[in-house]
Amino acid sequence: MDKHITTPITEEVTKDLKSGDYVYITGTIYVARDAAHKRMIDALQRGEELPINIKDSTIYYMGPSPAREGRPIGSAGPTTATCMDRYAPTLLDLGEKAMIGKGKRSKEVIDAIVRNHAVYFAAVGGAGALLSKCITKSEIVCYEDLGAEAIRKIEIRDFPVIVVIDSQGNNLYETAIKEFAAI
């Protein structure tokens, strides 16, 4: 089923999303990869506040290429999510509601998704140039020294994703294998 949602993504929204749903997201989300995630967790361990508002946030695991003239961002394809697995449960426990990436997630992340009524979306790998057309604005908000791994805030319009793991823990990567094995 196709669904259109707007950020911030709240628990009421995540409870309505089911594994396998096609979703189009509009609104403001953050972009961060493993170096930025590590830096956020290190800051928390030092007793510092996060540099972004994590409550009801969506983080897209992506490292953009340089923007072409007249565009807010270059190619914007997803990064493999497992690189963030050691950090994701902490951010989910602090209020993050959605993650966008590609690939499988660890049991610890799936448990945190269920515990916090969050979701994990997949974006299509290899389609970064097409995905960038859904990004209308991009700005670095912190950790500029990380270059392409700096945390960005981006505005998106009808950004296409698929619900891979829903708030109940249903996992498309597992159910799809079983479904196609039965054919």
Where are these regions (language model features)?
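Short, structured beta-strand/loop micro-motifs enriched in basic residues and often containing a Trp
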Residues: 1-9
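Feature captures the catalytic cores and cofactor-binding loops of soluble hydro-lyases/lyases
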Residues: 31-32, 36-159
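Active-site/ligand-binding-proximal alpha/beta "capping" segment
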Residues: 87-88, 164-183
